[in-house]
Every structure is written in C-alpha cells, then in structure tokens.
Amino acid sequence: MTMLKTKADPMIVSMGPHHPSMHGVLRLIVTLDGENVIDCEPILGYLHRGMEKIAENRTTLQYLPYVTRWDYLATMFTEAVTVNAPERLANIQVPKRASYIRVIMLELSRLASHLLWLGPFMADIGAQTPFFYIFREREMIYDLFESATGMRMMHNYFRIGGVAVDLPYGWVDKCLDFCDYFLPKIDEYERLITRNPIFLKRVEGVGFIGREEAINWGLSGPMLRASGVQWDLRKVDHYECYDEFDWQVEWQTEGDCLARYLVRIGEMRESTKIIQQALKSIPGGPYENLEARRIGLIGTDSAQWNDFEYQFISKKPSPTFKLPKQEHYVRVEAPKGELGIYLIGDDSIFPWRWKIRPPGFINLQILPQLLRGVKLADIMTILGSIDIIMGEVDR
C-alpha cells in the first residue's frame, strides 16, 4: 500500500459498511492525517450472492428473475443483456415492435437510475431539496413500468426473442405525456443546481480523471465520457434500433465531478428525446419471436421450420432451447457504464460459463487513486460521482 508522507501519526478510520452515504454495503478503510486522506482501501463482497454460479444451473428463462437483483435500480438493462446473449448465440431475430418496446423501457430505466443518482449525490454534498424533487418524477416512471410490466421494480419483462407482453392500451399516450412533463423538470434541476456557487465549490476540480487515465483504468459510461472520450455503446455496437433515432452522445472534457454531473443531466435529455421518437414511430406487428434457428451446424447455415434442427422456444422455462456450443461477449450501455456478459454455450440448456462484467466494479477500482490527497469531506463527493450499486459490484 503506497502512502503519502505525513506530519503526524496517521489515524485509520473505517467508513461503512453501513455509513448512510456509502451507497450500499461498501466499506472504506481510510488513513487520515488530520483532514487529509493519505490512503483508502475499499472492502467489497458484503453483498456477494454467487450470481455467476447460479446461472450455470438455470436455463436463461429461469435465470431472468435473478438478474434484476444485480443493479436493482436499472433492472431493464440486466434483463436486456441476459436475453441478448442467447439471441446472438442462437441467431434469434427480434421483431421490430419488440425492439422499439425494449428501447423505450431501457431509456425509461436510464432516467429512473440517473434520477436516483442525482438525489442522493446532492444530499451527500449538503443539498436536500433535489433529493425530494427526484422522487416525484421517478414515481411517474415506476407507474409506467407497473402498468406495462406489472411490477414497479424487478420487472422480469424481457424474453428471448422479444418481450413478455405487449404495451397496454393507452400506455403510449401516457408515456408521451410524461416526456412532455419531464423535459421542463430537467431545466428546473439545472436552474436549482448547476450554477449554484456552493455546489460548484464542492464539485469543480474535485476527483479529476484525465482522458488517458480513464481509458487505461477501463472506465465506461459517464465516468469515461466526462473525461473527453465519446464512447457510447448505443452508437458503437448498433444494438436494438438506436440507429433509427436522432440523438447525441453526451460528453465533457473536464474529467471532474462537475463534468460527470453534466454528462448525466445531458443523458436524461437525450433519453427523453429517444423515448419520444420511439413512441411516435413504434411499428405494429408481433412483440415476440418464439423461433430459434441453430447456427454453426455442419452443412447447414440456418434451420428451416421443417428441419430436424428447428427449435421452438417455449414461453415457460422448459428444456427445449439449447445454447449452441459457441462463446460470445454481449454488452449494453447501462446507466453506470458497460454491462457485459461473456457466455459460453455447451449444447445444453444450461450455460457452461456466464461471466458478468459489471460497470460499477470496474469504475470503483480508481477510487483509492482519486481519494489520495483530498480532504475528508470530498470522499462523499467523489464516491457519489462514480455511481455504484453494490448489488452489481459484488454480484
């Protein structure tokens, strides 16, 4: 452990795992010289539940309810990457309507996640008002989720080849009304926060990460884009139907806590624009595809409906859908960064390996370096700007 030189005997303080601003069961062993942080050691694992091992003896449909417990504030993204992996592996086509519904749900989930980042982050640095404001909008998003999926959180809505149920009657109009209501609220947050002199004193120049440093540490999401890297998997990987909408990648060059705040505020605007475009141009047709065509078989490119190799995916968890003997890495742009799954099929109904790449775990690695030399009060600002959820960090 490298430590800065100190004037006096250092004091070692344990923050967490139940400190109110620790954002979950994270423990920081902080070495202090007065109010200056000499060193910090994060202790993880308090929320480890063996999610990767559980996946190895569950079918994909049986595993779907588990994945919503990784990042429990952005559950649509964990579901999306969980169904995208077998879809890519078995070459399953997703109907256009299902793809649009997925994009709408993903962006609503991004809004809910960013809102619940903004409130506690502001509370961490001493501003209580936004903490109460964000729940007003978040409640409306959860009402939309509840009417479409039946659940406010842990939706269990995505399925291999589409979604579980179609959007209910009147849902599109209700969601458009929410978008019209929400855009002025983002302006209200900005008027309240962005140019506030006390807020700027707390975040400007704090927790600086340079461009090369961010790339070398493997950061992703707003952490990477706030350091001057225009990298968004929705533009890079062209998954779902994001290419059909007009939107911009939000990024900043400063690399401090203020830049990370501005990126997330900008992303809320862009997400609302994507939702509005998707709702206005959503096509008709089926919302699911229950056909699985096997690929990679000797002598066949893809199985036809009357071939022996043709497979039907049941809506219930059943052993009819086998994962081909291949491996694949699938990723989505979650609110916190790149959420990826490395899936190895073994010609079995169970995956041979299900490796999770959580964004929070990777982004948290840089925390000790950011905290060395700062004041004790800045720990909460820097940790809050990273935006971690311990469910996905510990898995």
Swiss-Prot record:
PROSITE patterns: COMPLEX1_49K (PS00535)
Compartments, record wording: Plastid, Chloroplast thylakoid membrane
Acyltransferase keyword on record: no
Protein family according to the UniProt entry: Belongs to the complex I 49 kDa subunit family.
Gene3D superfamilies found in the cross-reference section: Cytochrome-c3 Hydrogenase, chain B
InterPro entries for this protein: NADH_Q_OxRdtase_suD (IPR001135), NADH_UbQ_OxRdtase_49kDa_CS (IPR014029), NDH1_su_D/H (IPR022885), NiFe-Hase_large (IPR029014)
GO molecular function, one term: NAD binding
Gene: ndhH
GO terms, biological process: photosynthesis, light reaction
Superkingdom, taxonomy of origin: Eukaryota
Keywords from the named record: Chloroplast, Membrane, NAD, NADP, Plastid, Plastoquinone, Quinone, Thylakoid, Translocase, Transport
Pfam families cross-referenced by the UniProt entry: Complex1_49kDa
Protein name: NAD(P)H-quinone oxidoreductase subunit H, chloroplastic
HAMAP family registered for this protein in UniProt: NDH1_NuoD (MF_01358)
Subunit structure: NDH is composed of at least 16 different subunits, 5 of which are encoded in the nucleus.
Entry keyword Membrane: yes
